[in-house]
A protein has these predicted regions:
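Single, function-defining residue in the core of a domain
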Residues: 1-58, 62, 91, 98, ...
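Short, surface-exposed helix-loop/turn micro-motifs enriched in polar/charged residues
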Residues: 55, 73-76
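Extended, structured, electrostatic nucleic-acid-contact surfaces
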Residues: 66-74
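Active-site- or DNA-interface-adjacent structural scaffold in DNA-acting proteins
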Residues: 76-141
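Extracellular beta-strand-rich solenoid/capping regions of secreted or surface-exposed proteins
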Residues: 143-145
């Protein structure tokens, strides 16, 4: 009796097989492969992600238990835990990274006109942040973190129109967040929202010269002088001040010689005054505050996706770790 197509089989129909096979050929992923091809590896890891398996061993046991229907799921054959682990270690993770970027390139235009709450401008909006995943430095020596601990960082540039990652960069835990700005090609007229950890005036000035806009918060040790005041704001909205400032220390004003805008906002929920800095002098002060508030959308994204490496005890190489992270 035909009961229809399994949901998992319907999901994997969206994988562009032609493009995937091109990437496998490019990176020689199926070199000497017999039963566990790159495509079969991809399906098994996706199966584990969708079904909430906690480790590679769980994936293999679950697939073995459903051996009779694997063909209908689109999976050729289940493999042992050791075979799947070796495939993750040895097959170039760039295969799955470039597949992900290809799919993102298809999906992002579909949401390019999505409205963002309380935002009136039509510019491209990005939120930049990272999430840190703890691991054992003994079992994953490649994942160096602070204080002799193991950690991996996933730096994500999130397109706020649709909450779709525009770029993902995986590093060890010692990679400072501000270094990530050097990995990004600024998009003219786009807004980049980031917290104060990303305040690197040399990198931010590069964004400014590329006609891209950034919004962040000042560090506690930032020294500046006020050179202009603006009064075109409604205090009832929470805006307390709108200034144009200039950096005063020798190093900072050399790195960023142009004026910067500073907006002060009173948060009625916490009772605190919050300061924002930006290179955009045109939008309203309230728009600046609302844009930065949407930086929290990326925190929600990390929480919703539950970015954890459940099977990190298996990840004894960076290639293994990157492969599993990219497929989660």
């Amino acid at each position: 009796m035909n009961i229809g197509k399994y949901i998992f089989a319907q999901v994997i129909d969206f994988i562009p097989r032609y493009q995937f096979d091109k990437l496998v050929k490019k990176y020689k992923g199926d070199w000497h492969a017999k039963e566990l091809t790159c495509y079969n590896q991809l399906l098994q890891l996706l199966f584990g992600q969708i079904t909430g398996c906690d480790s590679l061993r769980d994936i293999c046991m679950c697939l073995e238990a459903h051996n009779g229907i694997l063909y209908h799921l689109g999976i050729r054959k289940y493999v042992t835990h050791s075979s799947l682990s070796r495939a993750n270690e040895n097959r170039d993770y760039h295969i799955y990274e470039e597949l992900g970027m290809y799919l993102i390139g298809i999906v992002r235009p579909m949401y390019s006109n999505t409205k963002v709450a309380e935002i009136t401008i039509d510019n491209v909006l990005y939120a930049l942040d990272s999430t840190t995943i703890s691991t054992s430095i003994v079992l994953a020596a490649w994942a160096l973190g602070k204080y002799s601990k193991g950690a991996v960082k996933m730096h994500t540039l999130l397109d706020l129109r649709g909450s779709i990652p525009a770029n993902i960069h995986i590093t060890d835990g010692k990679w400072h967040d501000s270094n990530e700005l050097d990995e990004i090609v600024p998009e003219p007229l786009a807004f980049y929202m980031m917290d104060k950890a990303y305040v690197d005036f040399l990198a931010l000035f590069r964004f400014h010269k590329a006609d891209a806009y950034w919004i962040s918060r000042p560090k506690d040790n930032m020294r500046y002088e006020v050179i202009d005041h603006r009064h075109d704001f409604d205090p009832s909205t929470g805006i307390c001040g709108d200034f144009t400032i200039k950096l005063t220390t020798h190093k900072s004003k050399k790195l960023y010689p142009e004026p910067i805008r500073m907006v002060t906002y009173h948060d009625s929920e916490t009772g605190n005054d919050v300061e924002f800095i930006t290179n955009n002098l045109e939008i309203s002060a309230l728009e600046v505050a609302n844009l930065y508030r949407h930086r929290w959308d990326i925190e929600v994204f990390f929480y919703d996706k539950y970015i954890v490496m459940r099977s990190y005890p298996d990840c004894n190489t960076d290639n293994h770790g990157f492969t599993e992270l990219l497929l989660r």
